Amino acid sequence: MQTRNAFSCIKEGITRSISISVMIYIIIRAPFSNAYPIFAQQGYENPREATGRIVCANCHLANKPVDIEVPQAVLPDTVFEAVVRIPYDMQVKQVLANGKKGTLNVGAVLILPEGFELAPPDRISPEIKEKIGNLSFQNYRPTKKNILVVGPVPGQKYKEITFPILSPDPASKRDIHFLKYPIYVGGNRGRGQIYLDGSKSNNNVYNATAAGIVKKIIRKEKGGYEITIVDTLDEHEVIDIIPPGPELLVSEGESIKLDQPLTSNPNVGGFGQGDAEIVLQDPLRVQGLLFFLASIILAQIFLVLKKKQFEKVQLFEMNF
């Protein structure tokens, strides 16, 4: 009986250890696997700077296009689509964190006007749900429901991302008005070149930190290189570490300059930002416009009928 209890305790202890290890792994890995929105959320209170620049560009250095499509106007308390397109060459492969090549992921940030927010699931139509797929959107901050982020997600499946947006109702929110509002978007494809702490990722160019002669190049067992540079002036040695991923451009015995690229640029992705405008339309104004158009059409009809009646009278008088 004691043997069984001891065995049960050991089994329970092993299970707990495995669970704790898995949890620690997930916590440690989360910032890297969810690099696009998480890094920005951790470092910036607002993703759009006063200059208009979206902060994702601080880590994704290459400039790439992005496109957004929204309706010209929407009525209050209605759900509409904001479609973000992130184009790139589907054939290219990016350098992964382990130095191997893999497919590109994409991510996006959508900055809506105050009052606009992600539509609740029960308000989203089946057609829009089909376009959304398995995407999961989140608020940039719990207090900033008008700023949405998504990603990283597979680029081959989500080059086009559909955000379901709920427009505000000025009748229930006094700080909302029937006006034209700007919408800002940022979209990236591929990994970034700079981490939040300013250090380089392996998806970047590595330059020489000293001028001199390349004395020795050691290829590491897990990938990457250790390059020893001898300064020609005072003979002191400088060691540059290259992570796995970038291709080496220099060889032993070669003379190099300060800041000369030691590797190729492996980055095939990039970040882009754009904007659009949307009008929160007053239903009474729409009704007034329809009434005005209807009155014009009726006036035209009466004018035509009156003209025909006048022509008949003239024809009748001519016969007499």
Curated annotation (Swiss-Prot):
The protein's required cofactors: heme
Source species of the chain: Phaseolus vulgaris (Kidney bean)
GO biological process, one term: photosynthesis
Full protein name: Cytochrome f
Superkingdom of origin: Eukaryota
Signal peptide positions on this chain: 1-35
Topological category with respect to the lipid bilayer: Single-pass membrane protein
Entry GO MF terms: electron transfer activity; heme binding; iron ion binding
Origin organism lineage: Eukaryota, Viridiplantae, Streptophyta, Embryophyta, Tracheophyta
